[in-house]
């Protein structure tokens, strides 16, 4: 995924009201960005460090600028836009990068499924093969060298694990795919210290036949894309 038009830099001042962040430009001007991340963004906020943002030409938008990347104090990059995860996975599937998920003829997004009124992020289908239901989660929390998900208690995430277990019980292929949008994360683990119920459900899901994958992103101010798989430590 290429950033076009090119991203612009600024210095993070603060994030507030969940969806807003103030930054300072090189000329000293302060502007407000839309923050496209509903999570806690735990360990992803570094006031004074460089952020990268995109700009929309849509005159109807209240906030024209969108926060895309955060630079860490060690020079790493974090993909702030959690909504990009699905598009990154679709792009990687079309290029055959996710080798565990090749051999399908069609890809659909946001299809209703399960018994808790959910929509699957990605549905892969092919003749004479079980349908493949993929839930995509963006992982950005780094603590003591380990990547974790979720970064806050996630009832929605718990529901999605139950839905995947249900689909696996029906004979479908059910996959949880972590998209690692943090260049310093090299493995993913359930955050039992944050959401113990999610961690327990993940173990049950694996025993129920749900596949769990994780892929790291290569990130720069020019582009972001899925690059290679990394371990999931349960």
Swiss-Prot record:
Chain segments annotated as transmembrane: none
CDD domains in the cross-refs: SfsA-like_bacterial
Database matches in InterPro entries: SfsA, SfsA_C, SfsA_N
Disulfide pattern: none
Top-rank taxon, per record: Bacteria
A molecular function GO annotation: DNA binding
Family statement: Belongs to the SfsA family.
NCBIfam families, A to Z: sfsA
Protein name: Sugar fermentation stimulation protein homolog
Name of the encoding gene: sfsA
